[in-house]
Amino acid sequence: MPFVVVITGIPGVGKSTITRLALQRTRAKFRVVNFGDIMFQEAVKAGWVSHRDEVRKLSLKVQRELQLKAAQRILEISQKEPVLLDTHATIKTPLGYMLGFPREVIEVINPRFMVIIEANPSEILGRRLRDLKRDRDVETEDQIQRHQDLNRAATISYAMHSNALIKIIENHEDKGLEEAVNELVKILDLAVNEDA
């Protein structure tokens, strides 16, 4: 039976770091799949982009097509082994925020758990400014908070279409990373035990 745990958070929240560290400690065995990487691979195959950060600037129609292709690939993987899906609940595009999982996509993936990683907007802004490798939009702290609020709302919608449980984990600069990693480890261990 397919088994997916989705982990989301806006760029700069520390989602990938928390995921990497939690997977080193959990008893559960998950394959980490990055939704954006799969979309990027599909977009490169089609000749639409050459850099990952260009995907969010494609037309909404093309992005939705890429999302559905990615969902099908994730479903195939999750039928063989549990998947920890690293992704974004919403994506900021030039025209506004796009849902990371339109209804037809979330219904294909059908996750068991949705984990949201959050931090204070000032912490996220600082992390983004230190990460010069990525081509990220410049946002104010208010815009960052709005994006996190939209992620919560979107995640509730996803849970409605998949019956997934929702967990919010906070990742703060002052000892928050260790606590966040421990919380995710508990969720991953619990997720696998619930499925047994």
From Swiss-Prot:
UniProt GO cellular component terms: cytoplasm
Enzyme Commission identifier(s): 2.7.4.3
Reaction(s) catalysed by this chain's protein: AMP + ATP = 2 ADP
Keyword Protein transport found: no
Sequence intervals crossing the membrane: none
Alphabetical UniProt keywords: ATP-binding, Cytoplasm, Kinase, Nucleotide-binding, Transferase
Protein name, as recorded: Adenylate kinase
Protein species of origin: Thermococcus sibiricus (strain DSM 12597 / MM 739)
Chief localisation class: cytoplasm
